């Protein structure tokens, strides 16, 4: 504008200020007009039959001789045009009145669809300005009345937040070099003004609610001026926002806006948590889909990987469908790779996700972890866990994951080979309180040493408990692992001394000791030097007439003279696997039988005694006598009435192996036989309250007690045990195993000549005491090998087989054993031997138990 030289600087300044005020008002009006038009356009359904604009530019109508002109050439220099443009001639106008010193004008706007705009940049509000608005585009020219046509354009000074708008074309994709691939996961950013920062995310902060697992763009600047496209959540700039353009995914319609808009504060969204007033299903952003979460595990930004792993842990919590889908989408490998991440919070979040994914009966995820070398990766993570609370939390998570993995048979040997030594040396030995010099260091600052580490110890012993039910090679490696048996026995001693006889840690420890005691008399080094010959002469078993009163009394007199326990002398304190069969460990087992109320602890304690008493070896003979001297026989017999059948079966197995000592057999017949008979059903019409396995165990124990014990056989007759056995032998819906066991027990009773006449007076016949023909003639594909079954007419009799059953996992399987399964009819006087593991289908008390599902952890 040309001004006379005579005018004062004050008048020039006043004129400039007036023009600036007018320009500001005009800018506000234009911004309001643009927003209104955009809102109308987004509500219009565009049809391809409408005629396009010929000139490719906008048309503005003129009123009162006040034109507003677009310059198409200038616009095209900054714009990406839509392919087709349509005008909806609805004669609708929106006018705005501007008042200044010179003239009042109205600006009519025609409703336009598919107009062209330039690529936008986010507007940053200047300090002290009145509000957040976008400046008028640079290609608008204003001419007012009384102003010379050569008046220079009033130009807004360049502002970092300067912005103009662009409507994306169909399937719009930015060609900027920093834009990620279209098929990749899209970042999600919260609304502005929330106070988050990059330092908060990189320090490992996880937001408090599940809505806070927003996924940030790793290429987005976190502060300051951005001279480029605005990265915002899909749908942030919609019909009501200041920017109609939004970033599109490959499956979205570029002309449809389904989400409301939340303007950003300045040019960027805050990376902080969600505002408390925001509903989870409101419009700012959507929850990421599972494939997107899995893709985010490989993002370059630490905060994205951290939130993705934590969110995946949340999604997989008690959700079997998500676990299967993660396995199908190959989500396990990126999680395992995150275990090597240099940042501890990311490692913890990834391990927590693996912990949840590996929980449950499904085996696919467990196998995927194994096949991706997840077990050695977890072992390495345990070794590099660090110190302090963070290190302890990571140790708990890693050991919990290993415990979950150990419930699958095909992973157990992998754990033995890759994680056994690490678990022992990193967790069990240093935190159990045991010292290699034999000292006791149970307390630190007034607490038992292992209390703070008890969760990690529980997980570790749970994992070892599961893998100890694997084959003999696993048991051998565990017995010979330096410090393992010593630490476990020390924990057992400490728990019993503190009265913690029902804790989960104690349960795992006792089950572990029971399992590694299985076949201990055969599998320890130099086992042959501990072997003994059978106590009873072989001639006793060949003739039924040998079961006489005089022979029984003779054995009793000979055994009463020797009722002492002579454990082998040792020059050095026992350590390692030698601790498994020492008198101290036997006393601990008996103490648990007397004081514990946990079925799993009772079962494991009785099973450990059963394993140690099996076989003809020096320590087996000494332990049978030690149990008697410690009053353990009566304590075991008291649990025959326990409500848990697993406990009853374990007690029966222990009593049967303890009957290898003739003095024990007499005492058990005197004090426990009535309880055994009471567990049998008293009516053939009434179905037994016990399962088939439990009934067979009870009958087999009765058989072992009355073998060579006339007084016990008489007591069985007086307690109506014969009636119950005959009912079972006659059938009445009983299984073949029950009928066969009852038949051989009755045959043993009829073998006592002293009892035949009283039995005949009671109305019994010889046929009532014979083994069922159907039971003996059929091929036995499934044989109860826990009892030495007696068939005196069978030649080539086999050795007796007494049960020695370690805890195993809950996967159902048949009862397996070594050797031939058919016609296993051994005698009572031969060697006490053992069987392979019995696999049960009970989850509550089995040897292999899953760890409880991990709660969402604050990482």
UniProtKB/Swiss-Prot annotation:
GO terms for molecular function: cadherin binding. Interacts with C-cadherin and with zbtb33. Residues 15-44 form a coiled coil. ARM repeats lie at residues 279-317, 320-359, 363-401, 402-446, 464-503, 513-552, 574-614, 621-660, 661-700, 701-746. Keywords: Cell adhesion, Cell junction, Cell membrane, Coiled coil, Cytoplasm, Developmental protein, Membrane, Nucleus, Repeat, Transcription, Transcription regulation, Wnt signaling pathway. One of its GO terms (cellular component) is cytoplasm. Ubiquitously expressed. It comes from Xenopus laevis. Key regulator of cell-cell adhesion that associates with and regulates the cell adhesion properties of both C-, E- and N-cadherins, being critical for their surface stability. Beside cell-cell adhesion, regulates gene transcription through several transcription factors including ZBTB33/Kaiso2 and GLIS2, and the activity of Rho family GTPases and downstream cytoskeletal dynamics. Implicated both in cell transformation by SRC and in ligand-induced receptor signaling through the EGF, PDGF, CSF-1 and ERBB2 receptors. Belongs to the beta-catenin family. This is Catenin delta-1. It comes from the Eukaryota. ARM repeats 1 to 5 mediate interaction with cadherins. GO terms for biological process: cell-cell adhesion; cranial skeletal system development; Wnt signaling pathway. It holds the Pfam family Arm. SMART domains: ARM. Residues 226-254 are annotated as: Disordered.
